From Swiss-Prot:
SUPFAM superfamilies: Family A G protein-coupled receptor-like. Keywords: Membrane, Transmembrane, Transmembrane helix. InterPro entries: 7TM_GPCR_serpentine_rcpt_Sra (IPR000344), Nematode_rcpt-like_serp_alpha (IPR051080). The keyword Signal does not apply. It comes from Caenorhabditis briggsae. Belongs to the nematode receptor-like protein sra family. It is a multi-pass membrane protein. It is found in: Membrane. Residues 39-54, 123-138, 207-234, 292-326 are cytoplasmic. This is Serpentine receptor class alpha-12.
Amino acid sequence: MSCASEVQAQLFTHPVQIIYACVQTVLFLATIIGSLLAIVQLCKKTTIPDSTKVLLIGALFFANAHELAYFSSPFKVFKMNLFHTNTSCYPLASTLECIPTTTVLAMGISGNMLIQSALSIFRLLATIFPVCYSRMRALPGVVLLFMVLIPSFLSYSWIRSDIVLDDYQMFCSQWSANISSRANTYLEYCSYLTVAHIIINALIILRNRSVESKCRFDVQQRYLNSETLKTTQTICYLSIAQFLAMFLYSGGVLFMRKNQKNIPTLIYINVIVWVYAPPYACVSLAPLILFSLWNLKKQRQIRIQSITVQKETQEDHIRKLQLSWG
């Protein structure tokens, strides 16, 4: 067992760390409760395709996995402040002992990124083959989710491959100093991947709007393109939220590390923990899904109401058809 240095010992009991632990506890509980509510709503009959539901539930699983692993940090802060009696030695965690926690943590981050890729791929294929994909129901989502699970679970093993983990750290939710450069590269790739998701989904939205306007008299095709358009917009909003969180994290960490020499150690560590943005992305996922479901339902009700309320004569209908045909 290794004991914390004087600065590290101060961090365990510092008011900023206690406040941060309380905030992370709230985020942890909010993520779990929000995810349960989102899953209940997703399981109800909605206009969202079954495959998209499967992938969104998968995204919630990865978000909760990340939060469960990351909660080990505030839990240790509370434990050190409430039950630790030997103030002369605050124990540090061995990176070898922390492998299970860090594996789940990396799985949560990777899973959320790769789920965005799976959602983008599914929306792209649904745009190209709308009728075929509407008949396959949940099968594409199950296959894509399985393809996401394996690399997500192995991501930390790849990051720490051929590197000896023989150091100690304050929390198991921290990356080992021996793999910090690889971890930074990995998170940068996650940010680039999220940008690609936004671009792909924006292109899919433009494509579906174009196709929808061209097939106004093909009721089935127009309906399929309309559903794909609405679902793709929802996925794009989720990708933007992920991007903002990863941008805050990668940009903030890069700024802090470049100016680390000019910042006292105690202040540096107390500030940089707030820049760790994945918990913000995780807690925002369920509210975004719930809002998207509510918005889709509201839009559908408005369309149905406009059709049922609007009254027109046969002459008005023929006149509209003549105008639309040019």
